[in-house]
Amino acid sequence: MTSLTDGLLRFSIHYWPMLNEKQFCDRAMRELREIGKQVLSLATDRDLYQKLEADVIQSNPNLSSSGSAYLSMLRGAYTDATTMRLRRLFAPDAALSLRRLLTQVSEYPALLHDKLTVKELSADLAELDRLSLYLKQQVEPHFSNHERTPAALSTTNRELDKAINLLIDSIKRYYWIVSDSYIDLDVSYGEDPLAVFRFPWIEAK
C-alpha cells in the first residue's frame, strides 16, 4: 500500500515517444502518487468544510439562523478555491494530467486485461471531460452574499463533490491497474480538527 503522507517524491517527468510497459507503469505510479497528494488535500478540505457546516454551524442556532457576512465569505471562499484547484487538476495540458495518463493507458492493452474494459475506460474519460467542461464553462466566482448561501452554492458544491469523488476513484483504480497495489486516499487527522472551535475566540472584556 502506498501512503501519500510519506516524504515528498523528487523526480522529473519526461514523456518519451513510447515506453515499454514497465517504464510506463513506473512513470504512471509516480504521477498518480503526485496527483493523489493534490486530490487528498482537496478531499481533506472538503471534509473539514462539511464538518464545519454539520457539527459547528448547524448544531448552533446562533450560527445557523444568522446571515453572518463572515460565514458567507467562508462558504464562497471554499467553493471558489475548490473550483480553481479542480480546474487545474482537470486541465489536459497540465504538467500532471490524469486525463492524459488515462488516454495513454489505452496504448498498453495488456494492462487492462481482466481489470478494465475499453468501454469502462472510455466512460471514465467521458466523465472527466464532462466535469472539466462544467468547471470551465459553468462555474463563476461568487461575490455577493445572496450568491454565497448554502442553497445558492448547493448545485455547484454537488458538482465539485462529483469531481473530487471521480478523481479519487480514478486514481485508486488506475494505480491498481499499473501497480497491482493500493493507494491510500482516505482523509485522516492527527488530532481533532474541530478543537479550534471548542474555546472562545474572543475573550470577554
Segments the model singles out, each with a brief description of its role:
Residues 125-153:
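Histidine-centered, metal-coordinating catalytic motifs and their short helical/loop contexts
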